[in-house]
Amino acid sequence: MNLEIVFQLTALLFVVAAGPLVIVLLASRGGNL
């Protein structure tokens, strides 16, 4: 496998995982949106 492909997959996984995580953090910190 190419290192560039691995990097792109890692970045994609990071974005997919960070999306809901940021929403949960904002919801828990700010209370109700």
Swiss-Prot record:
It is found in: Plastid, Chloroplast thylakoid membrane. The keyword Heme does not apply. It comes from Chlorella vulgaris (Green alga). The chain crosses the membrane at residues 5-25. GO terms for cellular component: chloroplast thylakoid membrane; photosystem II. HAMAP family: PSII_Psb30_Ycf12. Belongs to the Psb30/Ycf12 family. Pfam families: PSII_Ycf12 (PF05969). The gene is psb30. Keywords: Chloroplast, Membrane, Photosynthesis, Photosystem II, Plastid, Thylakoid, Transmembrane, Transmembrane helix. This is Photosystem II reaction center protein Psb30.
